[in-house]
Structure formats: structure tokens, C-alpha cells
Amino acid sequence: MDFKDYYKILGVEPTADEKAIKAAYRKLARKYHPDVSKERDAEEKFKEANEAYEVLGDAQKRAEFDEIRKYGGQHGRPFQAPPGWESRGGGGGFEGGDFSDFFSSIFGGRSAGGNPFGGARQQQRSAGRRGQDVELELAVFLEETLSKESKQISFQVPQTNAMGQRTGFTTKTLNVRIPAGVTDGERIRLKGQGAPGSGGGANGDLFLTIRMAPHPLFDVEGHDLIITVPLAPWEAALGAKVAVPTLDGKINLTIRPDSQSGQRLRVPGKGLVNKQGARGNLYAQLKVVMPPASDESARELWTKLSEKAAFNPRTQWSK
């Protein structure tokens, strides 16, 4: 198993803030997205970027990674987790995310002694007491909000004896279905899925805080999606049919003649699902991209157009 330095994968410093990490992830995800990149190893690099953001975009996972990084792991070199830091439950982790063995070995489980729950409430140490509630952040990709498949998560819960004394930790694995209409920051309660109670007390609850991962192609506005559609000048001037990605696959979008940068075209029912099960809209925002006049023939064409076209984009200044 090789060490993965998630900072190197995203191309950021270990001191980078959340905004810089998100920006680096979006840049790489956009570059290597299967709908965009033709590079042979694009799919692997896209997966690596997703895995790196899964860790560095989550404060708890990032803190654990920073701790394990202190043991001197070098990117791409053989690595073995230090004593006392062992994966339990067969690696666990976010199996639905297609992440590496390194990810599973670090985040699939830790030996007793640490407390990975941060703000989890302290259980009272007496018989017949309710178990701890567990707080986790769950990274969700836009595509997962449309899928009816479950997402497998693994996390640690403290174990106690009948006297309420902590005896260690165990890894718990659940299959979680992403609710329709889920939004960033939403908190979901899974009753009885937290730590077990002591002395016959009830189990605690599991609280999942949803964190929507940035998408390389789409921005989110409520339950609507925004995608920037680059156009050549002749496509904007003459009209065209353009293949545009959606979460359901590509569609052919009709560009009307005389279209302008900044215009938005609405595609009904291609956004995210709301609480009632209806889909929002996809808005295609047009952006005219100028080709370079890099050779003599291209410059001649632009010169002829400038001579024949009675067009002044600054006419409003002369009023």
C-alpha cells in the first residue's frame, strides 16, 4: 500500500484554508472530468481528486490525516499505518466512493484510546444510561442526490460496560440512503444508530451533517443547477445545436441566432430533486469564447469581417 499525500494531489500547501482547497479540487475535477478530458489517465486522476477532497474538505478527516502525515509518509512510497492505528471491520470507509486502500486503512477504523467524534456529547457513567449521540459530516456528490442507491459509511462508536465505563471503540457500518431534496448543511437524524446504552439504556442517535461536494461543471442555486456553455462566435451569431452535460447525461441544446454572452437558457426538470420529489431546472449560461487570430488567414478573415460588418459594440457611449 502506497502513501497518498492529499495535499500534493490537490496541489495545495498543508496550511491551505477551506476556500483554497475547494478551488483546487474544482480545478482538477473540471480538468479530469470524464465528460471533458480525453487524457488516458483522466479517470484515475478524477478519482484521486475526489478522494483528496473527501479528506481535506472534512475538518475531522483532515485533522486525522495531518496526524498520520507526521509519521513521515511520502507520496507514492510504501506505507504502513503506525502501531495502534489499525483499520477495523475489513477496511470500512466510504466504499460507495470507490476510494483507495490507503483511505480505508486510515479512515476505516482506529484502535481504542482516541476519540474521533470531537463534539459528541459525553455519556453519563451510570447504569441504565442512554448511549452517546454521534456527529458525522457526510460528503455528498450531486449525482448521489438523484440515485436511489445507498451510500455505505463506516464510523466508530464508543463501547461501555454496565457501569457506564468506556471499554474501547468499535467500527459500525451502515447503508444510508440520501434523502430527496437534501441540501448543504442539512442535519439528518438516524434514531438509535449512535453508541449503545449501558445497563439496558437506549442507544444514542447518529446525526449526519450533509456537505455537498463542489462539482466541476455545475453550480447550485437552491434546487437549480447552473452550467457555463462556451460558444464560438459563429455559433452565437448563426445559431447551433450544442451537446450539454446534465446529471442524467448529455442533451442537445438549441442556440438561437444572435445569442449573447451572459444569456441563460432554461432546461426544465434537469436540476436537483426537492423535498416533494420534483426536479429543479438547469440553466445554461452562454459564454462567447474568441478564437485566437494566431495565423495570417485567421487575421484576414477578422479583417474582412470588421470591414463589412456595420457593428459598433460601444454605440451607447455616443448618446
UniProtKB/Swiss-Prot annotation:
* A single MF term (Gene Ontology): bent DNA binding
Q: Which GO terms describe its biological process?
A: chaperone cofactor-dependent protein refolding; protein refolding
Alphabetically sorted, this entry's keywords are: Chaperone, Cytoplasm, DNA-binding
Q: Which InterPro entries match?
A: DNA-bd_curved-DNA, DnaJ_C, DnaJ_domain, DnaJ_domain_CS, HSP40/DnaJ_pept-bd, J_dom_sf
Organism's domain of life? Bacteria
Instruction: Tell me which stretches of the chain form a coiled coil.
Output: none
Question: SUPFAM superfamilies annotated for this entry?
Answer: Chaperone J-domain, HSP40/DnaJ peptide-binding domain
One GO cellular component term, please give it.
cytoplasm
| Record function comment | DNA-binding protein that preferentially recognizes a curved DNA sequence. It is probably a functional analog of DnaJ; displays overlapping activities with DnaJ, but functions under different conditions, probably acting as a molecular chaperone in an adaptive response to environmental stresses other than heat shock. Lacks autonomous chaperone activity; binds native substrates and targets them for recognition by DnaK. Its activity is inhibited by the binding of CbpM.
The name this protein goes by in its record: Curved DNA-binding protein
Upper classification of the organism: Bacteria, Pseudomonadati, Pseudomonadota, Gammaproteobacteria, Pseudomonadales
